Regions:
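Extended low-complexity intrinsically disordered regions
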Residues: 1-55
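Aromatic-residue hotspot detector
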Residues: 4, 68, 79-81
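Short alpha-helix-to-loop micro-motif enriched in aromatics/charged/Gly
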Residues: 47-48, 72-79
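Short, solvent-exposed positions on alpha-helices
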Residues: 53-57, 79-82
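Glycine-centered tight-turn and secondary-structure capping sites
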Residues: 60-64
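Alpha-helical scaffold segments in carbohydrate-active enzymes
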Residues: 65-72
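Conserved small/polar residues in nucleotide/adenosyl-binding loops
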Residues: 85-91
Length: 91
């Protein structure tokens, strides 16, 4: 299992309707949006300070937010966990 698959599995467990974390299960796109904004500012701050050790951790936090949104979208049938990893790159 690679690290992304591991992260997806962790999020699935956190959001599991029967055994998941109560806080994670009650979150919605709207309720986690402020956390995403906060994590984005922390990424930008680490870049401004040129603190690449901190940046590594902050990017991990931001990636966790992306996985959180993807899990919720999957639960709602909007897309699956694979589809959001297929990036559309500019030509």
């Amino acid at each position: 299992m690679n690290q992304i698959d591991r992260l997806l599995t962790i999020m699935q467990r956190l959001r599991d309707p029967e055994n998941g974390c109560p806080w994670d299960k009650e979150q919605t796109f709207a309720t986690i949006a402020p956390y995403t904004l906060e994590e984005t500012y922390e990424v930008l701050d680490a870049i401004a300070r040129e603190d690449f050790d901190d940046l590594r951790g902050e990017l991990g936090d931001l990636l966790f937010q992306v996985v959180f949104y993807a899990q919720m979208a999957q639960e709602e049938g909007r897309f699956d966990s694979v589809s959001y990893t297929h990036l559309t790159l500019p030509t």
